Amino acid sequence: MKTLYRDNKGLHHWLFACGAVLVLFYLIRGNRAAVNFWVYSVTLPFEQFLGRACAALPFSVAELLYVLAAVTAVVLLVLMVRYLIKSRQKGRAAYRCALFVLDLFLTVCAAFSLLWGANYYADDFCDRSDLSPEPVTYEDLVRVTQYFADHLAEASMHIARDENGLFTADRQEILNYADTVYDCLYDEFPFLDMPDQKPKGIFFSKIMSAMNFTGFYFPFTGESNVNMDSPAMLLASTCAHELSHQRGITSEQQSNFLAVLACTRCDDANYNYAGWMLGYIHLGNALYRVDPDAWQQIRDSLPDEIVLDLRYNSAYWAQYKGLTATVTQSLNDKMIKSYGDELGTQSYGAVVDLLVNYYA
């Protein structure tokens, strides 16, 4: 045993260092004041610095790192297999390889916990705004759903459509507008005021679709990244959602709420449509589970072109239903829950409570 430790001293020190960071994170996460300081005075400014640095590049650095990580993983696998085959002491060689892989894994876990995981234990948007997702009444749910349907119909009159009657827009123009979409919220929520970095489109967007993702925030580069292949009608609200993560907001329900609020208040027609659409989809899904007849009545009041957009969106995502999407979403759900968010990915549906309480 001593020989194993001595022969792999560097790897063991690396392991202990990662373990110490994770233990320290576990012990400190219950101290709200300490976590708030760490998040809002250390990691958030650091991620904003990274975001500004990466903004100078026309491509997603996050996507490049994912590709490099995948290539590196394949190369390391080949090298380790070769090392194991050539080694005379198979057991020691296997131990060294396993220790190296464990070190890499724990390094990523420790870095992610410090840069992003800590945000789950800091004051969130609801804490800082005094808004909370209180339970809502059936009457309020119906009223707010109708309110969103009416405004969605109005917003639909101001956007462009293609020859098939579907929403159409220049996707790059949507991305270019994104860094101003939150300006309309600063008076009401001054703590949201910060310089935004425009979201970046992902080159391998079809892979994102297969994984059932429309966007993601990458704390190691401070970049918001969006799917450029999924239906364009919700691209603007996806941009706004991911920009909320640049502000350290981890809760998906709060990010969706802010996306709706920012999009519907800004002065861009494409963002207005996406905001009312996102809100209507969440509210409509909630109402359908409670009263399908009431949902149908509101759905029937929508103009045909909006129904066409909704059907196109459903058809697009239906083609990607399968094992990949299921596994990816399950892993994402477990990751979110591991940081104390008991709702996991179901917290996406809790945006309804925030919307109804705010608009009722």
Predicted regions and their residues:
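N-terminal membrane topogenic signal
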Residues: T3-L15
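Membrane-embedded alpha-helical segments of integral membrane proteins
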Residues: A20-R82
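Active-site recognition of the HExxH zinc-binding catalytic motif
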Residues: P58, L235-N256, V260-L261
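Transmembrane alpha-helices and immediately adjacent membrane-cytoplasm interface residues
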Residues: V74-V78, R92-C126
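Membrane-interface segments at or immediately adjacent to transmembrane helices
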Residues: G117-D187
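Post-HExxH zinc-binding segment in Zn-dependent metallohydrolases
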Residues: E139-R143, F148, T250-A294
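Auxiliary, metal-adjacent structural segments of Zn-dependent hydrolase domains
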Residues: A160-M228, A232
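Pan-zinc metallopeptidase signature
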Residues: E305-A360
